[in-house]
């Protein structure tokens, strides 16, 4: 399990959009994104290097929590909460390989710091 907390200097609504809207996800996570944002919905992420990952949406609580189950094992859970400096994002990933969590961390830091 990998757990990471990051505080973003943006309102919760804006961070939620960055995590759930395909166009916003394409700004910082993957090159092509499709998400059916409802429990049981499908999600797919494609990168320019040819890598592709698929997931199923497990939980959706707008502006609070989003959980995906990766089709190749593991889950990733995003939990948002208010923070004096903006919005706190807690990412918990349970997956045999650490690559997704580490990629997410690097992308998130780039997104915040431009």
Predicted segment positions?
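Hydrophobic ligand-binding cavity/cleft-lining segments
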Residues: 1-34
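Hydrophobic-ligand binding "helix-grip"
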Residues: 34-39, 44-96
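A conserved amphipathic terminal alpha-helix motif
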Residues: 94-114
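Generic macromolecular interface patches on structured domains
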Residues: 25, 35, 67, 108-111
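Tryptophan-centric aromatic hotspots in well-structured domains and transmembrane helices
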Residues: 16-19, 28-29, 70, 97-102
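Residues at helix-coil transition
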Residues: 20-21, 30, 62, 103, ...
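Aromatic-glycine hotspot motif
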Residues: 1-7, 12, 77, 82-92, ...
């Amino acid at each position: 399990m990998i757990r990471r907390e990051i505080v973003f200097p943006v309102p919760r609504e804006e961070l939620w959009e960055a995590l759930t809207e395909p166009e916003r996800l394409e700004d910082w996570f993957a090159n092509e994104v499709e998400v059916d944002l409802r429990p049981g919905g499908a999600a797919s992420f494609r990168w320019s290097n040819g890598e592709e990952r698929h997931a199923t949406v497990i939980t959706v609580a707008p502006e609070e929590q989003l959980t995906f189950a990766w089709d190749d094992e593991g889950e990733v859970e995003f939990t948002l909460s208010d923070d004096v400096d903006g919005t706190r994002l807690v990412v918990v990933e349970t997956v045999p390989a650490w690559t997704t969590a580490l990629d997410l961390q690097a992308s998130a830091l780039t997104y915040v710091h431009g």
